[in-house]
Amino acid sequence: MTKSELVAQLATRFPQLVLKDADFAVKTMLDAMSDALANGHRIEIRGFGSFGLNRRPSRVGRNPKSGEKVLVPEKHVPHFKPGKELRERVDRNAGEPLKADAADDDL
């Protein structure tokens, strides 16, 4: 599901929202989540999962073009850990074929 599909589904589910307002709501939420992660905070959405940061230590890598060894610096990367309810729901539906264009009604 893309951001625009999420906006469209939000506008469909809540008819009082025009598409512009739904887009603003989704953008505001994603911006707040991005800011929280950028500032080192953890985000927990009960029943869905949590977003946090994982530390990747520095290491010696290799330039694939020249073969030269290079130092890859330490970095922090976003990480999503699904909650129990989401894991169970995905597991229940794991045997069903994937629907390429169908929107999930239970968002």
From Swiss-Prot:
Residues 56-107 are annotated as: Disordered. Keywords: DNA recombination, DNA-binding, Transcription, Transcription regulation, Translation regulation. It holds the Pfam family Bac_DNA_binding. Residues 65-107 have a biased composition (Basic and acidic residues). The keyword Transcription regulation applies. GO terms for cellular component: chromosome; cytosol. It comes from the Bacteria. GO terms for biological process: DNA recombination; regulation of DNA-templated transcription; regulation of translation. One of its GO terms (molecular function) is structural constituent of chromatin. The keyword DNA damage does not apply. Transmembrane segments: none annotated. SMART domains: BHL. This protein is one of the two subunits of integration host factor, a specific DNA-binding protein that functions in genetic recombination as well as in transcriptional and translational control. Belongs to the bacterial histone-like protein family. Heterodimer of an alpha and a beta chain. PANTHER family: DNA-BINDING PROTEIN HU, INTEGRATION HOST FACTOR SUBUNIT BETA. HAMAP family: IHF_beta. This is Integration host factor subunit beta. It comes from Paraburkholderia phymatum (strain DSM 17167 / CIP 108236 / LMG 21445 / STM815) (Burkholderia phymatum).
